[in-house]
Amino acid sequence: MAREDLSIQAPDGACRTSVFTPTKGAGPWPGVIFFMDGVGIRPVLQSMAQRLADAGFVVLLPDLFYRAGEYDPIDVGALFASPDGRKALTPFIGATDNHRAARDAESFLDHLQDRSDVSGTKVGTTGYCMGGGISLTVAATAANRIGAAASFHGGSLATDSEMSPHLLVDQIQGRVYIGAADNDGSYPPAMAARLIEALMAAHVDHRHDLYVGAAHGWTMSDFPVYHEEAAGRHWHALTALFMETLQ
């Protein structure tokens, strides 16, 4: 694993961050920001970031829970062991939101811009679960710096909240990819239709794929709902998106 652990000064403090580079070959390579899911930084996300890096990218994985202070990796098994298991996430998820993460992203983008091993003027973003909405939000708030943005099993992408990503899509300049599960209470069909309508109205270059048979969290190999076939399809879509837009 070609990994560098560092601290990036973000608006509300020092953000623990890992940067992954390809294990083979010589750079520079295009930069990508990997926005985590709501379970926090843990080995599966680090492995995913390295896999993406090995496709030919410099991947920055920030800990968006930095405002909550230091914490041990969350026990994913305990989260799903009982109905109350997910309550452990409450203080962490409350430490960030789409708007705060978008402000943080300016610092992440500056870091990538200053690295000698990063090429190009545009960066890609990808996000999972809560990170999906953050990925789309950053594609809007930093539109001139984002070449492509992806969301996989992202929730609450088109709601009545003032933080809803669909309200900002008219600012997006890059390409957008949405990978949605067909069994996801956080992103039901009516919400998907609302997001697609907003993307079309804003003339955003986008693709919206439904992963049939997949549930919320299907890309995460430490989740009970992990779907190997759909996860493989997600990798193909993600790497193709960035290879077509960031090279």
What are these regions (language model features)?
Residues 1-247:
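N-terminal cap/leader regions of alpha/beta-hydrolase-fold enzymes
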